[in-house]
């Protein structure tokens, strides 16, 4: 029998933490509702694991030899995992420095969503633990400057184990661990080792970190204005791309039907966008092409060198903003746009018009032909670069029992769902609606689709007045006729349909499987069908580009393929060669 062998050696310049061969006792690997074996893979031995469904976090724990790994010199741990099963899954990797690690303290975690047959690395960054020199004074940030101490940090000199697990799986999943390495040279962050004293304020008048210089950093107003002149000279030397039409389509390529709007067509076995002039169009762009962005300054005044928001000339860049996560959750606070203030100081009082014109030249100089989501309306409506737009279900009440990173899922059976979409789409009339330069519309963003059971279970865990729950129960009544018939299948003991309505406890997923999957499909299809109807009412010739999936299960993907002209994903990786659509259909895809 083959075993796992733990070593610390150089593997192509990387520190191999685990090598799967015959020299180590497999009892070092602890299984939680899972089974494993070492077997031969394509390029050597692998650890083959299958996780069950009886534990909240089934998986394996791999202990360090001699009780610990000293990874002080490294930046991250990388685990290479192959999905050897038939279903896509999201797998988590946790690195612990203490037996008491609890998912928040004394550990760091990352994850990857892996399709069947796909191999992907999970990189877990070793956020350092030491004395918190900031004294907890940094808050309300999406990321921290190598934050030392506190939750989600470890002591890299004392790494004791690596965990691989899947959260609440509804079916068994199988995967292979091909390697576990430490990599990336750790370079101590300047802010916490240079002992800048005092550290506060640490943001300069341009909104930049002040305790370090780098190539391209703006050092003065004169420097800012000099960069304007140098860019103007550079852009003047760049010629327009040859062989393209005004939209950026391939004018010298094959010709197709010109409809006056963007559309899709399969050409030689591959999906393409066809531009309004009938030319092949490969969309390559970026999101957030806008003039300003804001950061909260309330409760953080001491962070900033210059409190520009108090100056009369910069009042147009002061706003009130509402955050949806972290410290400022559900608070409306004063915000300031350093980006806007910089543009005003760089281009003068006509900065909006000057910058809007410049953006299109800048995009073309970078080889880009599309303005993506969340971009400035003034820039888009200049009609010089193709763009996408977005509509939102906005204030639709959520399914109360649902869960998600960005929030709960909207109740698509609530009457306000369609009403809110129509209100959002009405704002596009005379703007992007009917505009040939607008490729189409996304809806919402990175929604909480969960697994194939989540939204159905969320409906059942909601109060009795939840519209989705009412629809689900009506469907069950039509199928089973009596509560007794439902109880027999689900293994439940509801005394009446009203008893089911009042209950907020989820049934056994295995026994209620067919009904849960069926209603999940109903929710997903209602979402995409309704959005499509609303878009086509106002912009019948423009494309529905989907909802920008970040996490998605096959049922939601299949529903999107049924109603979207193009299915969109937000794929947070550099390479999509191994990406596969899991919606059982041949549809055009776009990274949103």
Q: Predicted segment positions?
A:
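An active-site-proximal structural segment forming one wall of the substrate-binding cleft
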Residues: 356-365, 370-379, 410-446, 468, ...
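Active-site-adjacent substrate/metal-binding segments within catalytic domains
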Residues: 207-381, 398-434, 509, 514-517
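Glycoside hydrolase catalytic-domain groove-lining segments
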Residues: 518-592
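Short carbohydrate-recognition loop motifs
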Residues: 37-59
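Extracellular polysaccharide-targeting segments
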Residues: 149-150, 165-195
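Extracellular ligand-binding interfaces
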Residues: 51-152, 158, 170-176
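Aromatic- and acidic-residue-enriched segments that line the glycan-binding/catalytic groove
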Residues: 288-305, 381-404, 433-439, 443-504
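Extracellular carbohydrate-recognition regions
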Residues: 13-33
């Amino acid at each position: 029998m083959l075993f796992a062998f733990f070593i610390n050696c150089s593997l192509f310049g990387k520190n191999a933490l685990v090598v799967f061969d015959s020299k180590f006792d497999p009892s070092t690997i602890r299984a939680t509702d899972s089974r494993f074996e070492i077997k031969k893979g394509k390029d050597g031995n692998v650890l083959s694991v299958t996780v069950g469904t009886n534990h909240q976090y089934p998986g394996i724990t791999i202990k360090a030899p001699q009780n610990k790994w000293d990874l002080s010199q490294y930046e991250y741990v990388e685990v290479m995992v192959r999905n050897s099963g038939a279903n896509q899954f999201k797998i988590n990797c946790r690195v612990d420095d203490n037996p008491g690690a609890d998912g928040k303290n004394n550990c760091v975690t990352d994850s990857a969503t892996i399709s069947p047959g796909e191999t992907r690395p999970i990189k877990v960054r070793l956020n350092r633990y030491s004395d918190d020199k900031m004294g907890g004074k940094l808050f309300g940030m999406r990321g921290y400057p190598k934050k030392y101490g506190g939750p989600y940090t470890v002591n890299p000199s004392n790494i004791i184990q690596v965990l691989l697990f899947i959260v609440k799986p509804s079916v068994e999943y199988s995967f292979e661990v091909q390697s576990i390495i430490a990599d990336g040279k750790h370079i101590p962050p300047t802010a916490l080792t240079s002992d800048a004293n005092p550290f506060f304020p640490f943001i300069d008048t341009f909104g930049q970190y002040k305790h370090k210089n780098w190539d391209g950093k703006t050092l003065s107003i004169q420097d800012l204005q000099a960069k304007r002149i140098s860019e103007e000279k550079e852009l003047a030397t760049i010629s327009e791309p040859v062989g393209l039409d005004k939209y950026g389509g391939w004018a010298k390529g094959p010709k197709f039907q010109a409809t006056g709007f963007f559309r899709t067509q399969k050409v030689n076995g591959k999906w393409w966008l066809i531009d309004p002039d009938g030319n092949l169009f490969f969309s390559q762009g970026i999101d957030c092409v806008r003039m300003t962005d804001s950061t909260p300054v309330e409760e953080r005044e001491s962070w900033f060198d210059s409190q520009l928001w108090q100056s009369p000339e910069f009042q147009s860049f002061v706003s009130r903003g509402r955050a949806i996560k972290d410290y400022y959750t559900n608070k409306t606070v004063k915000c300031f746009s350093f980006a806007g203030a910089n543009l005003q100081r760089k281009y003068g009082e006509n900065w909006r018009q000057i910058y809007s014109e410049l953006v299109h030249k800048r995009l073309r100089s970078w080889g880009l032909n599309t303005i993506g989501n969340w971009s400035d309306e003034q820039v888009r409506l200049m009609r010089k670069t193709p763009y996408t737009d977005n509509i939102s279900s906005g204030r639709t009440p959520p399914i109360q029992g649902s869960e998600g990173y960005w929030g709960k899922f909207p109740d698509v059976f609530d009457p306000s769902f369609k009403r809110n979409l129509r209100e959002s789409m009405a704002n596009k009339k005379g703007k992007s609606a009917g505009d040939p330069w607008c490729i189409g519309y996304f809806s919402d963003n990175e929604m909480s689709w969960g697994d194939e059971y989540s939204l159905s279970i969320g409906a059942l865990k909601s109060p009795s007045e939840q519209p989705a729950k009412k629809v689900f129960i009506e469907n069950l009544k039509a199928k089973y006729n009596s509560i007794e018939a439902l109880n027999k299948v689900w293994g439940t003991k509801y005394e009446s349909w009203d008893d089911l309505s009042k209950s907020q406890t989820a049934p056994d997923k295995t026994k209620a499987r067919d009904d849960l999957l069926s209603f999940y499909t109903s929710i997903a299809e209602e979402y995409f069908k309704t959005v499509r109807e609303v878009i086509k009412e106002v912009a019948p010739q423009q494309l529905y580009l989907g909802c920008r999936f970040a996490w998605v299960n096959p049922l939601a993907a299949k529903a999107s393929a049924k109603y979207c002209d193009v299915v969109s994903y937000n794929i947070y990786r550099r390479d999509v060669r191994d990406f596969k659509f899991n919606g059982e259909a041949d549809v055009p895809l776009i990274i949103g």
